[in-house]
Swiss-Prot record:
Localization (cell): Cytoplasm
Active site feature: K190
Family: Belongs to the NAD-dependent glycerol-3-phosphate dehydrogenase family.
EC numbers for this chain: 1.1.1.94
Protein name (record): Glycerol-3-phosphate dehydrogenase [NAD(P)+]
Domain of life: Bacteria
GO cellular component, one term: cytosol
Keywords attached to this entry: Cytoplasm, Lipid biosynthesis, Lipid metabolism, NAD, NADP, Nucleotide-binding, Oxidoreductase, Phospholipid biosynthesis, Phospholipid metabolism
Function of the protein: Catalyzes the reduction of the glycolytic intermediate dihydroxyacetone phosphate (DHAP) to sn-glycerol 3-phosphate (G3P), the key precursor for phospholipid synthesis.
Gene: gpsA
NAD keyword on record: yes
Class in the EC hierarchy, top level: oxidoreductase
Molecular functions (GO terms): glycerol-3-phosphate dehydrogenase [NAD(P)+] activity; NAD binding
Amino acid sequence: MSENIAVVGSGAFGTALAAVIALAGRSAVTLVGRNPSLISDLKAERLHEVALPGIYLPDTLEFAAEPEAIAGASIVLFAMPSQAQADAARQYGPYLAKDAIVVTCAKGIERATGNLLTDMLERELPDHSVAVLSGPGFAADIAKGLPTAMAIAAEDMQIAERLAQAISGRTFRLYASSDRIGVQLGGALKNVLAIACGIVEGGGIGDSARAALIARGLAEMSRFVVAKGGQADTVRGLSGLGDLVLTATSHQSRNLRFGIALGRGEKVDPLQGALVEGALAASVASRLAAGLAVSMPITDAVSAIIDGRLDIAEAIEQLMTRPITTE
């Protein structure tokens, strides 16, 4: 089935998604951005030198700077940062086709409310089906055509399968899921754990500590996902374990690099420059976990370090002297 797909958000990830879907050749694809000058340059040069230097975009990819460009799309992907998605829904919502499916591609939690992004989008766009795309995929890898697999989840499995068919290509494979909660929380929480792994690397705390953080962090993710109504199996899949391993070990990860800077004692503002989603998610997740009586000591420690309530030595001391328990 051929689809008309619009990708809203002309940053690295949105551009990479639009490019790989266009290359699959099954759907008409338009990349929609809010910067007319950038869109004009992309049309002329087929190159996004700021976000994806040296990677040329396919000739079949269309570009637009007007919100009404999404009007004919059957699938609309929101590829801007998590905290910008509510504003995007309000801006683009009036132009959505009646039966358009909206897919959030951000990995975060709404900071003001603690809501999942699908919940927020359903609040803003109550007449539309909302899905989520998440998993281990860096924009540059996707745009270069390197093999990448991610998850796409909708409450209706038939919609998830339709989206997986429409978006997948030779180098980009999506697995369908009906667990929107698990897929979203995996994407949000792994960013927090990647910061923790960066702190370990930057502080020279050792590879053994990193391995412990990944394993125990996965346990935290699983407890939280189940408490929120998601499935533990999802945490062990692409959007949980897969994304955690990638983000906690690759220096392409903004969250890992932010953690490394913290571990070195550098003063870094996570809201300056490229947004560090995990820094925003840490305090929200810590607060929500407390309300659910879910133990998340690593997430709590990362939140406290970012907020300046604990230094790294104190955080390690607290983690290592917790009461002995079973795994």
